[in-house]
């Protein structure tokens, strides 16, 4: 930066001892010499003005003619008149020109010279002048050639650089000395060489020094007030804490000692200020005296800022202003604001203290600014410290976010996918994961189910529960806690909540005298938790403020879990893998299944496995088609209840026909509950099947009716086979099976087997008439003819039922309503349920059994079981969904018709041309192409009589064998197994279309009374024909298919009006 020339520059005159020379007007030569000199040119001669001018003539060539320099004040003048006027009024004191561009306070001229005198008189500068002795010999030490420019800093004279030393040693052989100072632009002083070096003492600078010291003392007092504020706050915390540890006491002692040190520093500052005030009154005060009056800093501890070693090191911003941040950083971590209750500067007068600091001059504002920043940070800690992690510097906005973060320290993942077993830390992650499973995509109901289960399972994952016994359950929350001595502190809640919520609290280990013995399921040597009210004090240094985690909160539990993660387990209900503490041993056992993947509870319908029985119960509701219980209708004769009015009507007709005794059966004490189910395996042995407890909230028969084995070898039988001796009982059981679901075929087949067992065990001369009728019905159920579609596969074993003449049939009009609703299982070797059962409303049918009955007999070893090849029935949810293409249908019949498109099944065959159709409606339309009249009853009768062997077109070659060997021979004392060889014949179309009207008009076959020990005997040439809705009638036929004459003694049908009433179809 270029320096501008001063208007009136002055030369520094180093001669002070010379007296005043007589003023003489300069000669022309002198004027020329003075004019030849540049402004600010040095005066090389220490003599008078004449000598100087003479010596300077040969040195410099004159440039200007009108330059005049005063010998006293070294002022330069360019006009002679001005110079002469100045000579008259000139004094020895040289003027000082200070050019300052800053706005700070500028010290006076006297203080500037006094400061220069101090610097020159400092002992560190060996070549400086002594203040009291400014002789010519002293001047020679610096060199008479030297010209010193005193540059004062433009900023505030508060930093150590403001009063700095001049360069040491002699100045080089030059007449100009420049000193670069920071923060200055232009500041030049010129003094005469003969001017005295600070002839006046530096008493004028003492008030400024005292002012700075007072500012420093004010800062110290503010620090003392702040530390006192901290001490009061800590005392308030200590008053709230019930138990203060040793560390807390040490912290308080350290804080008190620090406050006392601050007080001592303040006292030292006050003493120093008083000493300086006394010495300031002495005008002959030197720098050495000031040095002797410096503050003693050797006794100041390192916690406080050490004072400077000299007066010049006193600044407006000493290290003492950083006492508060340093002090806060030196405090133990327990005293820092980790919780909202431990926030500094919270009292109302702290803000007043900081506001008072703003009244200082100059640099004291920095203290208020830094304290304000600290106050803002402290207020931020109030907001953020509430959810601050104690183990890492992360801060969260909500408590739930902090809980999720704490799981990263514990490694806990409480949310488990029930399908694949993957674990997650948050419920949202589990939800997203569940939506990716194809099982959940197919059935969205499972998502809500799994989420509910996940919420319940994750509710007590972090709890460290303490079991409360029954005798202490009456304790209130306000009861005095019992302190536990001799145990490590875990920072637990101060009071333990009794009652059911006690499992959510945490407990530590108890003394040995309070610990019961280890449980057999826990590890050896691991004591159980004691009982009773337990109180554990918080950790030393931890303060419970207004924002601290509540007792028993999840955040506190997670924090304790992090602290105790490396400790050995002492709880018998604690998981050794993830260290989670469960409420009881059963919960712990279920929890271990999440680690091992064990799922012992398996659904017998779909084969899915679950880890708990409750989950299995919830899952069974998916398979339950209808859960509501409809209004039941009671039979007026035997008081049996039915949900379907049509079934009740048929039941009453059975009473009137003599098939069911009119006397009501004795009530069984196990109404609405099924006996122990029986599972029949391939080897014929019967075994009990486990069923759920009644306390689990599910009816036993409701569960057992849905039990389907995972394989085809075992089938559950809800009612023992001996119970089926009564027709009403068997009817009720089958109705109950149907109301629970449409797939109870195995029980129906078991009923047939049990009926054959009874017939074979009750008498050796019994014929297979009843069994043949069952087999015929069984095979006709498997046939694909239109008649077999509506065949009722039901034949109870009873004396009344053995009467082959008690037959009831339905009209073709009844088939119209029933054909579409016939239920089949679309698998290999399919079977079907009777449509009457399918139309029955869901109910819990009361099973009525006699007072005494025999147990289920074992199956003969020589009889091949029919259940070995039975496929597992398909159970659908409430919506009827196709398992192959995924289409949904409103009813099971529509789904059944749709499934025929996949299998290619065409069960309805034309009796004239043999063409097959998938639906009965298509077959009916096809009949019209043969030219038959529209009267379906007439058409059916003509087809059945005129072309009785049309249905045997496919396998007609077996018809003579069937009629010759079996149908035309007496059916007495024939092994039931021998009837199985004709299964294929019956499937091929042996069941012919017999018109119901003709049967009713011709009359039925008379029933022959038989005893309980023998089965019924069917006359030669009779074949049991089962209709779609009732047990079929026996038509006497000859070997060539002609209809035989009915004897006169045979009774007619008991219900001639059955056709008209049966037209009512209830879906």
Curated annotation (Swiss-Prot):
The lineage of its organism: Eukaryota, Metazoa, Chordata, Craniata, Vertebrata. One of its GO terms (molecular function) is DNA binding. The modification Phosphoserine is found at residues 53, 308, 785, 798, 1029. Pfam families: zf-C2H2. Residues 693-704 have a biased composition (Acidic residues). Sumoylation with both SUMO1 and SUMO2 regulates the stability, subcellular localization, transcriptional activity, and may reduce interaction with POU5F1/OCT4. Residues 1-62, 115-140, 471-521, 682-716, 752-835 are annotated as: Disordered. The gene is Sall4. Transcription factor with a key role in the maintenance and self-renewal of embryonic and hematopoietic stem cells. Belongs to the sal C2H2-type zinc-finger protein family. A zinc finger (C2H2-type) spans 68-90, 387-409, 415-437, 573-595, 601-623, 633-655, 880-902, 908-930. This is Sal-like protein 4. One of its GO terms (biological process) is neural tube closure. Residues 119-137, 707-716, 752-761, 798-809 have a biased composition (Polar residues). PANTHER family: SAL-LIKE PROTEIN, SAL-LIKE PROTEIN 4. It is found in: Cytoplasm; Nucleus. There is a cross-link at residues 151, 317, 379, 846 (Glycyl lysine isopeptide (Lys-Gly) (interchain with G-Cter in SUMO1)). Residues 15-42 have a biased composition (Low complexity).
């Amino acid at each position: 930066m270029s320096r501008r020339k001063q208007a009136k520059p002055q030369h520094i005159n180093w001669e002070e001892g010379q007296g005043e020379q007589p003023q003489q007007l300069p000669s022309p030569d002198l004027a020329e010499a003075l004019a030849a000199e540049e402004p600010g040119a040095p005066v090389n001669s220490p003599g008078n003005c004449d000598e100087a001018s003479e010596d300077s003539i040969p040195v410099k060539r004159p440039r200007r003619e009108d330059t005049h320099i005063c010998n006293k004040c070294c002022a330069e003048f360019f006009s002679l008149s001005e110079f002469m006027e100045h000579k008259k009024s000139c004094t020895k004191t040289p003027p000082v020109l200070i050019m300052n561009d800053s706005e700070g306070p500028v010290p006076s001229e006297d203080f500037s010279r006094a400061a220069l005198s101090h610097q020159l008189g400092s002992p560190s500068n060996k070549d400086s002048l002594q203040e009291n002795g400014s002789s010519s010999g002293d001047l020679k030490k610096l060199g008479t050639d030297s010209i010193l420019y005193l540059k004062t800093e433009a900023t505030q004279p508060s930093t150590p650089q403001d009063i700095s030393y001049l360069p040491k040693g002699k100045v080089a052989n030059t007449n100009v000395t420049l000193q670069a100072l920071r923060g200055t632009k232009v500041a030049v002083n010129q003094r005469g060489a003969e001017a005295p070096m600070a002839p006046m003492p530096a008493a004028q600078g003492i008030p400024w020094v005292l002012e700075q010291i007072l500012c420093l003392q004010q800062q110290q007092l503010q620090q003392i007030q702040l530390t006192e504020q901290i001490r009061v706050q800590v005392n308030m915390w200590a008053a709230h804490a019930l138990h203060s540890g040793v560390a807390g006491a040490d912290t308080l002692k350290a804080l008190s000692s620090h406050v006392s040190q601050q007080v001592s520093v303040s006292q030292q500052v006050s003493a120093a200020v008083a000493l300086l005030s006394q010495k300031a009154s002495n005008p002959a005060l030197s720098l050495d005296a000031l040095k002797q009056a410096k503050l003693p800093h050797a006794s100041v501890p390192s916690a406080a800022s050490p004072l400077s070693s000299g007066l010049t090191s006193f600044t407006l911003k000493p290290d003492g202003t950083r006492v508060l941040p340093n002090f806060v950083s030196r405090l133990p971590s327990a005293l820092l604001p980790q919780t909202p209750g431990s926030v500094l500067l919270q009292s109302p007068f702290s803000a007043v203290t900081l506001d008072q600091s703003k009244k200082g001059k100059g640099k004291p504002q920095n203290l208020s600014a830094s304290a304000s920043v600290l106050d803002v940070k402290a207020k931020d800690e109030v907001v953020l410290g509430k959810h601050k992690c104690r183990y890492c510097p992360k801060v969260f906005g909500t408590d739930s976010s902090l809980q999720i973060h704490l799981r990263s320290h514990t490694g806990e993942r409480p949310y488990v996918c029930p399908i694949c077993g993957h674990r997650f830390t948050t419920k949202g992650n589990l939800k997203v994961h569940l939506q990716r499973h194809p099982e959940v995509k197919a059935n969205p109901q499972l998502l809500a189910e799994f989420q509910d289960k996940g919420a319940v399972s994750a509710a007590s994952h972090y709890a460290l529960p303490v079991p409360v016994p029954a005798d202490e359950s009456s304790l209130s929350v306000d009861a005095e806690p019992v302190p536990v001595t001799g145990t490590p502190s875990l920072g637990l809640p101060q009071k333990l909540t009794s009652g059911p919520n006690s499992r959510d609290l945490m407990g530590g280990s108890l003394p040995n005298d309070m610990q019961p013995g280890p449980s057999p399921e826990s590890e050896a040597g691991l004591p159980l938790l004691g009982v009773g009210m337990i109180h554990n004090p918080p950790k030393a240094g931890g303060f419970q403020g207004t924002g601290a985690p509540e007792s028993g909160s999840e955040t506190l539990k997670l924090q304790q879990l992090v602290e105790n993660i490396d400790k050995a387990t002492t709880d018998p209900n604690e998981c050794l893998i993830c260290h989670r503490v469960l409420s009881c041993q059963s919960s712990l056992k279920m929890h271990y299944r999440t680690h091992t993947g064990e799922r012992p509870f398996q659904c017998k319908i779909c084969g899915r496995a679950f880890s708990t029985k409750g989950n299995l119960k919830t899952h069974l509701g998916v398979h339950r088609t209808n859960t509501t219980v409809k209004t039941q209708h009671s039979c007026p004769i035997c008081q049996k209840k039915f949900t379907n009015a049509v079934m009740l009507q048929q039941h009453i007709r059975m009473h009137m026909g003599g098939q069911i005794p009119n006397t009501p059966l004795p009530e069984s004490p196990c109404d609405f509950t099924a006996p122990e189910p029986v599972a029949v395996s391939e080897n014929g042995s019967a075994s009990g099947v486990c069923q759920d407890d009644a306390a689990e909230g599910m009816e036993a028969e409701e569960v057992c009716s849905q039990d389907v084995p995972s394989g085809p070898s075992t089938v559950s039988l809800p009612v023992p086979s001996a119970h089926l001796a009564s027709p009403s009982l068997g009817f009720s059981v089958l109705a109950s099976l149907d109301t629970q679901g449409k797939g109870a075929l195995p029980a129906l087949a078991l009923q047939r087997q049990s009926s054959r067992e009874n017939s074979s065990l009750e008498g050796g001369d019994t014929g297979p008439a009843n069994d043949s009728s069952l087999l015929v019905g069984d095979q006709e159920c498997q046939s694909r003819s239109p008649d077999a579609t509506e065949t009722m596969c039901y034949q109870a074993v009873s004396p009344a039922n053995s009467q082959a003449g008690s037959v009831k049939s339905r009209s073709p009009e009844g088939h119209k309503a029933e054909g579409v609703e016939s239920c089949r299982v679309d698998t290999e070797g399919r079977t079907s349920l009777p449509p009457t059962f399918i139309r029955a409303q869901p109910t819990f049918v009361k099973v009525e059994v006699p007072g005494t009955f025999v147990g289920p007999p074992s199956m003969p070893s020589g009889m091949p079981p029919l259940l070995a090849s039975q496929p597992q029935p398909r159970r659908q949810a409430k919506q009827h969904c196709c398992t192959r293409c995924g289409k949904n249908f409103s009813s099971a019949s529509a789904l059944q018709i749709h499934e025929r498109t996949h299998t290619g099944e065409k069960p309805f065959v034309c009796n004239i041309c043999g063409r097959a159709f998938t639906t009965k409606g298509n077959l009916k339309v096809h009949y019209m192409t043969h030219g038959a009249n529209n009267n379906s009853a007439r058409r059916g009768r003509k087809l059945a009589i005129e072309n009785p062997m049309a249905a045997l077109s496919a396998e007609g070659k077996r018809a003579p064998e069937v009629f010759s060997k079996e149908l035309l021979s007496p059916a007495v004392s024939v092994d039931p197994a021998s009837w199985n060889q004709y299964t294929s014949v019956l499937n091929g179309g042996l069941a012919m279309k017999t018109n119901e009207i003709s049967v009713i008009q011709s009359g039925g076959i008379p029933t022959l009374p038989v005893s309980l020990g023998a089965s019924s005997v069917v006359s030669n040439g009779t074949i049991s024909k089962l209709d779609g809705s009732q047990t079929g009638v026996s038509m006497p036929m000859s070997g060539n298919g002609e209809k035989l004459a009915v004897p006169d003694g045979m009774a007619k049908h008991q219900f001639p009006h059955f056709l008209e009433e049966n037209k009512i179809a209830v879906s």
